[in-house]
């Protein structure tokens, strides 16, 4: 049975950086439409991610993001600049154990943990959330 909610971590899962220490906010688009930080450093995503998100949306999966970042504002800003908010109906972006994030997903969506699939690059997050009964996959530090 396919998952009813697919949840992604952000840092080193959807993009190859930590938003709380790898870039300097504010982020913006430059004259060529590239996303850059305060110093002009380009901010990139893993190459296959946009196509994957578009396909999942087309196939009508519910999607969420769960991030423990210490800079939720910059993470949200990057999601907005990428125009990715359209993909993620559920967003829990704040420091803390991801069990709390998933408790909110279950409460807000009505979807049981067993029907959620979680992608993350950090084993501790996968270990914590798997105790709830979610399915999971490690991204091996990216993409």
Q: For each predicted feature, which ranges?
A:
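Short helix-loop-beta connector
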Residues: 1, 112-113
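Alpha-helical substrate-recognition element adjacent to the catalytic core
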Residues: 1-96
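Structural signal for hydrophobic/aromatic residues that build the beta-strand cores
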Residues: 12, 102, 118-119
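Surface-exposed amphipathic alpha-helices with a cationic face
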Residues: 50-58, 106, 126, 130
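Hydrophobic packing residues within well-ordered alpha-helices of enzyme cores
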Residues: 75-79, 102, 129
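Short, surface-exposed basic-aromatic patches at helix termini and helix-loop junctions that form
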Residues: 80-84, 108-110, 129-135
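Short loop-to-alpha-helix "cap/lid" segments that border enzyme active sites
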Residues: 96-108
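Acidic, Mg2+-coordinating phosphoryl-transfer loop and its flanking beta/alpha structural elements
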Residues: 113-143
């Amino acid at each position: 049975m396919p998952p009813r909610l697919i949840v992604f971590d952000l840092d080193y899962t959807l993009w190859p950086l930590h938003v709380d220490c790898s870039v300097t906010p504010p982020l913006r688009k430059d004259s060529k439409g590239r996303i850059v930080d305060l110093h002009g450093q380009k901010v990139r995503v893993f190459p296959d991610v946009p196509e994957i998100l578009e396909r999942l949306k087309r196939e009508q999966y519910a999607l969420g993001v769960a991030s423990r970042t210490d800079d939720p504002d910059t993470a949200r800003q990057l999601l907005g600049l990428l125009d990715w908010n359209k993909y993620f109906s559920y967003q829990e972006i704040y420091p803390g154990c991801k069990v709390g994030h998933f408790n909110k997903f279950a409460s807000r969506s009505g979807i049981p943990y067993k029907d959620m699939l979680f992608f993350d690059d950090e084993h501790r997050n996968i270990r914590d959330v798997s105790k709830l009964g979610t399915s999971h996959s490690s991204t091996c530090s990216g993409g």
